[in-house]
Amino acid sequence: MSEAIKTDVLIVGAGPCGLFAVFELGLLDVKVHLVDILDKIGGQCAELYPEKPIYDIPGIPMITGHGLTESLLEQIKPFNPTFHLNEMIETVEKIGDPGFRVTTDAGKVFECKVLVVAAGGGSFQPKRPPVPGIEAYEGGSVHYAVRKMEEFRDKDLMIVGGGDSALDWVLNLHPLAKRITLVHRRDDFRAAPHSVEQMRALVASGQMDLLIGQVTALDGEGKELSAATVKGNDGTTTKVACNAMLPFFGLTMKLGPVANWGLHLENNLVPVDTGTFETNVPGIFAIGDINTYPGKLKLILSGFHEGALMAQKAVKYVYPDKRVVFQYTTSSSSLQKKLGVN
């Protein structure tokens, strides 16, 4: 076992709620490390909608998931948090009062006084479409999320699906791609009506293609696609040139090892005290989409509020003998000094 990394607080999840919690804890002189199963910072914002607009962040009329992540990282820079990406927490062992020993699937060990679970609903995994051999092209021509729109410039792009994600990316990537072919198993879409109307207008004007059926075969070399075969509902097959594919078959969410940490669960969510966002285990808190309480709204702004209240209780575990006085960043010279603004 490797030597333990000691920290005041360990946050599981580096999405917006986890990042803002770093800010609130940093104002209270609390040292933080974060662990995330993803290979990037930002949680759902980075994985699912990095370039899609978000309209309900207070004071910001519109911002992308990527933009929000970057702004939060800039905000917490004075507190110098440490990130551990591509790692999943496997075990949590109580070693003190307070105190936990936490291990990851990479063999890393942490010792912390407080554990904050900000892992969304668990880890998101895209549903793989039932196409023989598609896994061979994952990480190459087959993408389950759009992280950089420029990756699809001048591509023969096939988008598979009939929901909002599929239609949104048809419309957003149409100006960049060489040609887009949308494939759906039926001529009936579960997307916003105005998106469907715009897509049909592009098809009618010959600017993109729509095939009703299912992808049954892929051609290519290594991880690079060259064509995909679509079988129509009438049994006819069409081979389409395709060097990039975006399948949108939904996502599965796995709670993972959180279920084994001794936390009470309700429908795979963690009940919390709404005054502190502490779980049934003293010293373990849950903020963001992973928690539940009466009136819970799964909004980013709700997670920010939860992180602020969590920090006020967590600091008492870190500094049990310290009198903590609540201060405002607008008027406290000591807080402004921590933020580097005076």
UniProtKB/Swiss-Prot annotation:
Q: Which residues bind FAD?
A: 17, 36, 44, 49, 89, 124, 289, 330
Q: Which reactions appear under catalytic activity for this entry?
A: 2 reduced [2Fe-2S]-[ferredoxin] + NADP(+) + H(+) = 2 oxidized [2Fe-2S]-[ferredoxin] + NADPH
Looking up Pfam families in the UniProt record yields: Pyr_redox_2
- Cite the cofactor comment: Binds 1 FAD per subunit.
What are its E.C. numbers? 1.18.1.2
> What domain of life does the UniProt record list for this protein's source?
Bacteria
Q: Name one GO molecular function term.
A: NADP binding
Q: Which UniProt keywords apply?
A: FAD, Flavoprotein, NADP, Oxidoreductase
Which cofactors are required for activity? FAD
Family of the protein in this entry: Belongs to the ferredoxin--NADP reductase type 2 family.
Q: How does it assemble?
A: Homodimer.
**Which protein are we looking at?**
Ferredoxin--NADP reductase
From which organism does this entry originate? Rhodopseudomonas palustris (strain BisB18)
